């Protein structure tokens, strides 16, 4: 496995690459969810590139940038064992300059749900993903469905900026008890982790209601909020694949989303129906 930190060096290294490139951008603290992305990339491409970059521009003031889990050596070993060809490990000053050009998230889709409570978050996400895609120039880039709003906005960016990359969505990986894997799970105390299971339980209950023929969003959301109590709920929402709120679930075109906090730890989860 080759490790590169300089963006220009990586661009030069890949400049004449004829093999198909699969790319997985991460912020490190890799887990089974990231491994699933790597495996999918290896199935579909001849060369796999993983980036590890804790992007400061997607964190708001007072958020967990400084305490975000850092496991650099473990991450290197995971990538090596998974057969990653290139690990891109850039520094902040290699990605961002003093006179920075940034992307702005769409006025509607980028500022609802997670974007409402974190108003500049998706500006930072889109900017760094755009930079990374321009450096690596992959055929395909891989993102988890757990971060559904992020996935939607990145797909929209790629489409509207006429970028030649396929965005591949990979199913959420869960613990045996249903908790969606997240690097932030490391923050949870044992008691908080037990409480966090209410998130997956609420989504299973919503799915069961739909299977019984209950499609009314208001009824489903009310039931989910009851299950989630007393968690600190940022939002429970039912949207279509364009992230417009739905009054009724549309099978094949719906995402049910939850964001809730336990202490200072925010957890996201969703189900695609």
Curated annotation (Swiss-Prot):
Reactions that this protein is recorded to catalyse: (R)-pantoate + beta-alanine + ATP = (R)-pantothenate + AMP + diphosphate + H(+)
Cellular component annotations (GO), alphabetically ordered: cytosol
The organism's place on the tree of life at top rank: Bacteria
UniProt-listed Enzyme Commission number(s): 6.3.2.1
Places the protein is found: Cytoplasm
Pathway given in the UniProt record: Cofactor biosynthesis; (R)-pantothenate biosynthesis; (R)-pantothenate from (R)-pantoate and beta-alanine: step 1/1
Binding site for beta-alanine: 58
Molecular function GO terms recorded: ATP binding; pantoate-beta-alanine ligase activity
Example of a GO biological process term: pantothenate biosynthetic process
Active site per UniProt: 34 (proton donor)
Main EC class the enzyme belongs to: ligase
Family annotation (SUPFAM superfamilies): Nucleotidylyl transferase
Family annotation (Pfam families): Pantoate_ligase
CDD domains noted in UniProt: PanC
Residues at which ATP binds: 27-34, 144-147, 173, 181-184
UniProt: (R)-pantoate binding residues: 58, 150
Keywords attached to this entry: ATP-binding, Cytoplasm, Ligase, Nucleotide-binding, Pantothenate biosynthesis
This protein's record includes keyword Glycoprotein: no
Binding partners and assembly: Homodimer.
Further details from the record: The reaction proceeds by a bi uni uni bi ping pong mechanism.
Family to which the UniProt record says this protein belongs: Belongs to the pantothenate synthetase family.
Job of this protein: Catalyzes the condensation of pantoate with beta-alanine in an ATP-dependent reaction via a pantoyl-adenylate intermediate.
NCBIfam families: cyt_tran_rel, panC
PANTHER family: CYTIDYLATE KINASE/PANTOATE-BETA-ALANINE LIGASE, PANTOATE--BETA-ALANINE LIGASE
Protein name: Pantothenate synthetase
Lineage, top ranks: Bacteria, Pseudomonadati, Campylobacterota, Epsilonproteobacteria, Campylobacterales
Gene giving rise to this polypeptide: panC
């Amino acid at each position: 496995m080759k490790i590169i930190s300089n963006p220009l060096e990586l661009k030069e290294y890949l400049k004449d690459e004829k093999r198909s490139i699969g790319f997985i951008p991460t912020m490190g603290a890799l887990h089974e969810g990231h491994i699933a992305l790597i495996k999918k990339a290896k199935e579909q491409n001849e060369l796999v590139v993983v980036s590890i970059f804790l992007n400061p521009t997607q964190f708001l003031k007072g958020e967990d940038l400084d305490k975000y889990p850092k496991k650099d050596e473990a991450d290197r070993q995971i990538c090596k064992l998974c057969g990653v060809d290139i690990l891109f490990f850039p520094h902040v000053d290699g990605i961002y300059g003093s006179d920075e050009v940034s992307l702005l998230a769409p006025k509607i889709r980028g500022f609802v749900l997670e974007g409402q409570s974190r108003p500049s978050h998706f500006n930072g996400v889109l900017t760094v993903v755009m930079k990374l895609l321009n450096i690596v120039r992959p055929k395909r880039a891989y993102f988890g469905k757990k971060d559904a709003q992020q996935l939607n906005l990145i797909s929209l960016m790629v489409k509207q900026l006429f970028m030649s990359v396929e965005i591949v969505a990979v199913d959420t990986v869960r613990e045996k008890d249903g908790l969606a894997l997240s690097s932030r799970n490391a923050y949870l105390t044992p008691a908080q982790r037990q409480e966090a299971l209410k998130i997956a339980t609420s989504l299973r209950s919503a799915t069961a209601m739909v299977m019984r023929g209950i499609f009314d969003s208001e009824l489903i959301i009310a039931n989910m909020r009851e299950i989630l109590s007393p968690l600190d709920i940022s939002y429970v929402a039912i949207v279509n694949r364009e992230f417009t709120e739905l009054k009724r679930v549309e099978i094949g075109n719906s995402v049910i989303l939850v964001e809730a906090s336990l202490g200072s730890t925010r957890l996201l989860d969703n189900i695609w129906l």
